[in-house]
A protein has these predicted regions:
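Conserved active-site segment of CheY-like receiver
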Residues: 8, 81-85, 104-106
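Acidic, metal-coordinating helix/loop segments flanking the phosphotransfer/catalytic sites
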Residues: 33-50
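Active-site residues of response regulator receiver
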Residues: 54-55, 82
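The feature encodes the CheY-like receiver
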Residues: 58
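Short amphipathic alpha-helix used as the core "switch/output" element in two-component signaling
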Residues: 63-75
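Short, flexible helix-to-coil linker/hinge segments that flank and couple to helix-turn-helix
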Residues: 90-94, 105-156
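Recognition helix of helix-turn-helix DNA-binding domains
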Residues: 175-210
Length: 225
C-alpha cells in the first residue's frame, strides 16, 4: 500500500508515520511539505492508494489544492486533514471531491477506522460536524446517524438500491459526472440519470453533495470501481 502525505508540519507527518504503520504490513509512505512537492510526488508515484491532504498548506488554498489533485488523479481517493471542524469547510471539501474529512484532533483509533473505510470504497465524515450542519436531518439521514451511532453499517441493498445503482453511487461519490459514469459502466447516459434519480430518492436527498454526506453517515462500503 502506498500513501502520500501532504502536510507542512513535521510533527504531524511524524505522528501519521507511527499511526499508519499498523494500517498495512507492506506500507510505503511518501511525504511532501507543501503542495508543489505533493504534486511532484504524485506524478512520481503513479500507483498511489491514498492521498492525505492538509488544507492549511503554505503555498496553496486548501480547496484549490484538493480540486487540482482530484482533477489530475481522480482514481486516487483523497482524504482531507484539517485543523478546522467548521461545517462549511467540511461541505466545501466534499463538494471538491474529498472522500473523507478528518479533523486533526481525531484519535489514532478513529483515524485508522476512517482510512480503512475510505480504502474500502466508503466516505468518512465526522458525524458531530454533520449533525451541527444538518440541524434536523431528513428521515434517511436520521436513519444514517442512528446506524452510525449504533455501530451497524447498512448495505446499499438495505436502503433499497440495486447492484447497478450501488455501482453508480460508488462513482458518484468520487465526484464523477454522468458522462464518465456511463463510460465506466458501459451504459447509456440516460440510464445513469435514471439511476441517479433513484439514488437521490432512496437517500431522501436532492443533490449529489447531500448524497455523499448520506453515504458518509451510513458508513456504506461501496464496491471500488
Amino acid at each position: 500500500m502506498k500513501i502520500l502525505i501532504v502536510d507542512d508540519h513535521p510533527l504531524i507527518r511524524e505522528a501519521l508515520r507511527h499511526v499508519l504503520a499498523v494500517l498495512d504490513a507492506d506500507i510505503a509512505l511518501i511525504e511532501a511539505q507543501n503542495f508543489a512537492e505533493g504534486l511532484a510526488a504524485a506524478s512520481d508515484n503513479p500507483n498511489l492508494d491514498l492521498i492525505l491532504l492538509d488544507l492549511g498548506l503554505p503555498d496553496a488554498d486548501g480547496i484549490d489544492a484538493l480540486t487540482e489533485l482530484r482533477r489530475h488523479y481522480p482514481a486516487v481517493p483523497t482524504v482531507v486533514l484539517s485543523a478546522s471542524e467548521h461545517p462549511a469547510t467540511v461541505m466545501r471539501a466534499i463538494e471538491a471531491g474529498a472522500m473523507g474529512f478528518i479533523p486533526k484532533t481525531t484519535s489514532s483509533h478513529l483515524l485508522l477506522n476512517a482510512l480503512r473505510l475510505v480504502l474500502s470504497g466508503g466516505v468518512y465524515l465526522p458525524t458531530e460536524v454533520l449533525r451541527q450542519h444538518q440541524g434536523t436531518p431528513e428521515p434517511a439521514l436520521r436513519l444514517a446517524v442512528e446506524a452510525s451511532d449504533g455501530g451497524k453499517m447498512l448495505t446499499p441493498r438495505e436502503i433499497g438500491l440495486t447492484a447497478r445503482q450501488a455501482d453508480v453511487l460508488a462513482l458518484l461519490v468520487q465526484g464523477k459526472p454522468n458522462k464518465l459514469i456511463c463510460r465506466e459502466l458501459d451504459v447509456a447516459e440516460g440510464t445513469v440519470k435514471i439511476h441517479v434519480t433513484a439514488i437521490l430518492k432512496a437517500l431522501n436527498v436532492t443533490n449529489r453533495t447531500q448524497a455523499v454526506i448520506a453515504v458518509g453517515k451510513l458508513g456504506l462500503q461501496l464496491r471500488q470501481i
